[in-house]
Amino acid sequence: MTIQQTELQELPLDLKRELLPKHVAVIMDGNGRWAKRQGLPRIMGHKRGVDALKDLLRCCRDWGIQALTAYAFSTENWKRPQEEVEFLMTLFQRVLRQELREMVEENVQIQFVGNLTALPRSLQAEISRSMEETKNNRGIRFSVATNYGGRQEILQACRAIAQKVQQGLLQPDEINEEVFERHLYTAGISDPDLLIRTSGEMRLSNFLLWQMAYGEIYITDTLWPDFDRTEFHRALCAYQQRERRFGKV
């Protein structure tokens, strides 16, 4: 950690605590491009990306942000080279195993969102263990979107609701936003106030399509492995200058 990074362990004076987003989501883009620029294999970009995420999680905790959601693996990521996918599955499992004790000690509550049944069974076991051992923690809520797709999430919610209607457990006129949200992967998690996307790409990439209806979006050209507290500080400064209207004038 640089001197500048150390200085940012406390909430910067130009940020107002009452105006901080309660929930930040991140699309961690640019690991492969970062590795290519460094003349390294793509997998090294993913390893550095894990370090960047760990620092962001601690930064959110240090600065009083209540929730962080990270887009770790999309439903489309299965189309990547098999070697890279297998590495990512192994990396997720290893990081969970190595970091769980520290997460428990730091009062982090871990939650995974997505179609988890399609993941390797060994990874599913680590995911279940991490959620079970941190379920009573009341610090920052850390959600990891894994095998997640926004369209698929909405479709599965519709199917689940339709099945309840068919079974007579729910009446059509009882279906509202609250009922719908209870059937999403993110049930019980507040909508993000701020979505940060790295690497300069300007799209949602099938991430939190329902939940981002009124969220603010911040795009940075910085590649994910280079995203640090200084970059996060810039994102929060930009967020605090915006006026959130939630569809109102």
From Swiss-Prot:
The keyword Transmembrane helix does not apply. Substrate binds at residues 30-34, 42, 46, 74-76, 78, 80, 197, 203-205. One of its GO terms (biological process) is polyprenol biosynthetic process. Its EC number is 2.5.1.-. The keyword Transferase applies. Keywords: Magnesium, Metal-binding, Transferase. Mg(2+) binds at D29, E216. GO terms for molecular function: ditrans,polycis-polyprenyl diphosphate synthase [(2E,6E)-farnesyl diphosphate specific] activity; magnesium ion binding. Its cofactor is Mg(2+). InterPro entries: UPP_synth-like, UPP_synth-like_CS, UPP_synth-like_sf. The active site is at D29, N77. Binds 2 magnesium ions per subunit. It holds the Pfam family Prenyltransf. Belongs to the UPP synthase family. PANTHER family: DEHYDRODOLICHYL DIPHOSPHATE SYNTHASE 2, DEHYDRODOLICHYL DIPHOSPHATE SYNTHASE FAMILY MEMBER. Homodimer. Catalyzes the condensation of isopentenyl diphosphate (IPP) with allylic pyrophosphates generating different type of terpenoids. This is Isoprenyl transferase 1. It comes from Nostoc sp. (strain PCC 7120 / SAG 25.82 / UTEX 2576). The gene is uppS1.
